[in-house]
Amino acid sequence: MKARVDDRPEEEEEVVAEADVAEHGRTADGETTSLDRRFFMQLQAFGGAGDTEQLVLSLEAAGVEGVLYEDVNDPRGVALLTLSETPDTFVSQLRGFLQSGPFAELEPKPDLTMLGRTYAIGHEQDLEDTLVERPRGRVLDPELRWAIWYPLRRAGSFEQLSRKEQNAILMEHGGIGMSFGRAGLGYDIRLACHGLDKADNDFVVGLLGPELHPLSIIVQRMRKTRQTSLHLERLGPFFVGRVAWQSAPA
């Protein structure tokens, strides 16, 4: 007869770890730090936008924090990137804003909707900069006129690798981004979207730069890495746009 849960030997009982939802980093001296703050970012795309100027005026009047892009692949397409430290913003102020005024007349493109949160991987020395200040500064930087946004889902094979193997793969991937960033050609925004994406993706990536060509090269280079070539299940769809409006940096 199968034993009831309360009849199992004590040594077989599962040890439940304490829930911890904070982001963690590490000081230069090796001390662990934590911060329970993060930015949520959402991209919503629309068609049927004949007059971008009216959209800009409505965004400024409402005090929306974010970016309006013109879709390079759709002459009547736009996308609105909004950011907030609380997801309530997207279903309260933003929801009401999009249901009225010029945005209410547009045609939503739900297949291009992306929602994610900033995160730390454990070695960052300045968590506030990593999670809040740097991502906000990047998307609102007037010099970074072009953007490519896309979701991705890792294959299960990546999760079966050891931590050492995972780190080596991520360093290869991250090295490309750092080299382009040092040259001022492109910067990335990486957001976790576990459980936040209707297609069950894992991450949302934004590539931002003063010109579009280097951003395309970043994607091309990353195709050759072990993570993309061996351990990705899905990549895209891609939104490609140029900044039409940005809110003032905080």
Descriptions of predicted regions:
Residues 1-63, 75-76, 83-179, 210, ...:
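Short S/T/G/P-rich N-terminal loop/turn motif that feeds into the first structured element of a domain
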Residues 69-75, 193-199:
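A short beta-turn/loop motif at secondary-structure boundaries
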Residues 80, 205-207:
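Conserved RNP beta-strands of RNA recognition motif
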